[in-house]
Amino acid sequence: MTKLKVGAVIYDPKVTVIWGIIAKFFEDENFPIEPVYYKDYKGQVDGLLAKEIDVAWNSPLAWLDTHLRTKGTALNGSMRDTDRDRSSYLVVKTNSNINSIQDLRNKTIGFGAIDSPQARLIPINHLHKLGLEFGKDYTEKRFDIGVGLHGDHVGGELDSAIALKNDEVAATWMLDLNYNAWIADGTLDENQVKILSKTDFFDHCIFSGHPELDVARFEKFIEVLHKMDYNNPSHKEMMDMEGLKEWISGRTSGFKQLTEANEYLDFFKEFHGE
């Protein structure tokens, strides 16, 4: 049987190390896979639909792109334990006199890259639901680092956080995990910033399978993947790099806010020219 081809986007050099370890594990489990690398998520989704690969390790936005372009027929696979129930935080300075969303009317708000679900798309939809309309009620200051990587490159999010510290923006958006990390490492001082608003929970990355991929083969891939054990030192290294302790069953209910954001902004039409 030919190797199952699995796509991954190189948002960081460590990605090839991660997938080298995963491929070795699958080889040892007598279910060989071949990692195929892409420079951005659009290329990966294009590759999946063109059958260059059988499975894609997708960002939430790449999942939505795949879902829409296959009219909902793509297969949905596993997630990391850390992909579920994420939230984005709207952060302001404690001395800013900004105490409500409405206080941001006509102010400048910092966002991550144009295609970041957590630092731009879901936040814009959140503001919309709370009465602040994009392009009208506030000024967007965007930090386009790693466009095409769907916010996996944290640079834009970090630059926006630094802009808040430097009073270049009145507020900034960041993923909950990044907020916690930046408070812990001193990038942000918890005495100088506060969380003004939090989005509802959403989910992050997920495996997508080509609609015509044999379902039993896809399920076997998932079964083997779930055998990875954080207590096994040879697995732990990879799992730490990939930010998980356990592979879990995927779900798509956590992509509702991102789906709404795409509809509100007509994002794919603008971004891909479709």
Q: Where do the model's predicted regions map?
A:
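Ligand-binding "clamshell"
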Residues: 2, 66-78, 134, 182-196
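An extracytoplasmic/periplasmic, membrane-proximal ligand-sensing/linker region
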Residues: 2-5, 13-18, 202, 208-209, ...
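A ligand-binding cleft/hinge motif common to bilobed small-molecule-binding domains
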Residues: 57-70, 123, 128-129, 158-190
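Bilobed "Venus flytrap"/periplasmic-binding protein-like clamshell domains
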Residues: 3-29, 38, 61, 85-160, ...
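Hydrophobic residues within well-ordered alpha-helices
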Residues: 48-49, 104, 164-165
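Short Pro/Gly-enriched coil loops immediately N-terminal to beta-strands
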Residues: 77-87, 196-203
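Active-site/pore-lining binding-face segments in mid-to-C-terminal subdomains
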Residues: 176-214
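N-terminal low-complexity or amphipathic/hydrophobic leaders
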Residues: 42-66
